[in-house]
A protein has these predicted regions:
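Acyl-donor (CoA/ACP) binding surface of acyl/acetyltransferases
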Residues: 1-36, 55, 64-178
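Conserved GNAT-fold acetyl-CoA-binding loop/helix
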Residues: 32-52
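Extracellular/periplasmic catalytic domains that process cell-envelope and extracellular macromolecules
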Residues: 58
Length: 178
């Protein structure tokens, strides 16, 4: 395995593996799930995307985690730290499969990822790039203690996607947790 495994009350966060392809592809073929994470994506493109995320772990020592529900062992999404070239900052992002929305998994997993990014990667700022129409993700950001910093610009091919940059510093994160 290329990185750590983080365990929360209900989740296991681990670097993605080739065995995650089928649920990851189903996630990216579900219109509701994929709406704010690049849109519907055919399986061959998702295959390359999954391999790219695995490559982030190999090249950078971090990337999105696969999210596994502890009770069932089921893949329920992907989330975590990443910082693609041209991105507005170092992001902890999330995407949870439709069947598992509303369970608090994004907040629980993102909180563990923020802790790890601050403590192990030394990140000095954490952002979340959120489409203004994605009110559920805005709710996650608020629960995490992040604030809306205003509009941001994504790199190609997402340059026309509207986003607001939400974020906080490690000091703000740690103060909120007290």
């Amino acid at each position: 395995m290329l990185g750590p495994t983080l365990v929360t009350d209900r989740l296991i966060l681990r670097p993605p593996e080739a065995i995650d392809f089928e649920p990851w592809a189903a996630f990216m073929l579900d219109e509701e799930s994929a709406k704010f994470v690049g849109g519907l994506t055919p399986a061959p493109t998702t295959w390359r995307g999954l391999r790219s995320m695995i490559g982030c772990w190999a090249a950078d020592g971090f990337g999105m985690f696969s999210v596994i529900e502890r009770a069932s062992g089921q893949w329920v999404g992907r989330l975590g730290p990443w910082s693609p070239f041209g991105w507005p900052g170092k992001e902890v992002g999330w995407g949870i499969a439709r069947a598992h929305l509303g369970k608090g998994y994004a907040t629980e997993g993102a909180a563990a990822s923020i802790d790890w990014a601050i403590d192990h990667l030394g990140w000095t700022d954490i952002i979340h790039c959120i489409d203004p129409a994605n009110t559920p993700s805005e709710g996650v950001a608020k629960r995490l203690g992040s604030v809306n910093r205003g509009p941001g610009q994504m790199p190609p091919p997402f340059e026309n996607a509207p986003i607001n940059v939400w974020g906080q510093s490690p000091a703000e994160w740690k103060a909120r947790k007290r």
